[in-house]
Amino acid sequence: MTNADPHELQKFSDLAHRWWDPNAEFKPLHDLNPVRLGWIDSHAHLAGKRALDIGCGGGILSESMAGLGAQVKGIDLSNEALGVADLHSLESGITVDYEAIAAEAIAEREPGSYDVVTCMEMLEHVPSPAGVVSACAKLVKPGGWVFFSTLNRNLKSYLFAVIGAEYIAQMLPKGTHDYARFIRPSELAGFVRATDLHIVELKGITYHPIGKRFALSNDTDINYLVACRRGA
């Protein structure tokens, strides 16, 4: 059985045509991308590396990593999003190999094949995040890097990421997130410990509404990033 929620897939497929509009529903991803890209590159030094972007959607992060010199493959289960990603890759001239395949399936086919694996803003949208983390650990080469980002589960994250972002500021469409699927850092750490990955860094992401920008911080109460490495 595929580790995917049909409702979640349809939700993002319906918006796929707006993925690259920096002022539409995916504006937060566009605003967040330079921060997460810089953080990933500071650890993994992407130039010349083979990278896999799991849950790539329309390809915002995939193209950005390729632009820094990585050989990138992006995977997703939304054919609509992948169609948009392919088209934008042709328009931009930045080469990314896209495929509709689940993380668990490609892990069986290509174990230990990637220097870098990214799984950003995706774990909170699948039925079994532990299964995705396990697949990431299988996909990365010994000594390679795996990066996750997701949302903490607490009252503050509910108020800011759901009520604030979706209903008050309307930064995101209503229903984008299911609070019950948010993941505490301790829970994600448990998923990681069940593999041969180890956590190198945990960072928070803070949104500054006055400047309308994201920045790295030590506050992991809402959005957070985790850098992991596989043992050599």
UniProtKB/Swiss-Prot annotation:
Domain of life, per lineage: Bacteria
Catalysed reactions, as listed in the record: a 3-demethylubiquinol + S-adenosyl-L-methionine = a ubiquinol + S-adenosyl-L-homocysteine + H(+); a 3-(all-trans-polyprenyl)benzene-1,2-diol + S-adenosyl-L-methionine = a 2-methoxy-6-(all-trans-polyprenyl)phenol + S-adenosyl-L-homocysteine + H(+)
UniProt-listed Pfam families: Methyltransf_23 (PF13489)
Keywords per UniProt: Methyltransferase, S-adenosyl-L-methionine, Transferase, Ubiquinone biosynthesis
EC code: 2.1.1.222, 2.1.1.64
InterPro entries in the record: SAM-dependent_MTases_sf (IPR029063), UbiG_MeTrfase (IPR010233)
Binding site for S-adenosyl-L-methionine: R36, G55, D76, M120
Keyword match Hydrolase: no
Pathway in which the depicted protein is active: Cofactor biosynthesis; ubiquinone biosynthesis
One Gene Ontology molecular-function label: 2-polyprenyl-6-hydroxyphenol methylase activity
Enzyme class: transferase
Gene Ontology terms: biological process: methylation
Signal peptide: none
PANTHER family assigned: METHYLTRANSFERASE, UBIQUINONE BIOSYNTHESIS O-METHYLTRANSFERASE, MITOCHONDRIAL
Role description: O-methyltransferase that catalyzes the 2 O-methylation steps in the ubiquinone biosynthetic pathway.
Family: Belongs to the methyltransferase superfamily. UbiG/COQ3 family.
HAMAP family: UbiG
Protein's name in the database: Ubiquinone biosynthesis O-methyltransferase
Organism, scientific name: Burkholderia vietnamiensis (strain G4 / LMG 22486) (Burkholderia cepacia (strain R1808))
Lineage: Bacteria, Pseudomonadati, Pseudomonadota, Betaproteobacteria, Burkholderiales
Gene from which the chain derives: ubiG
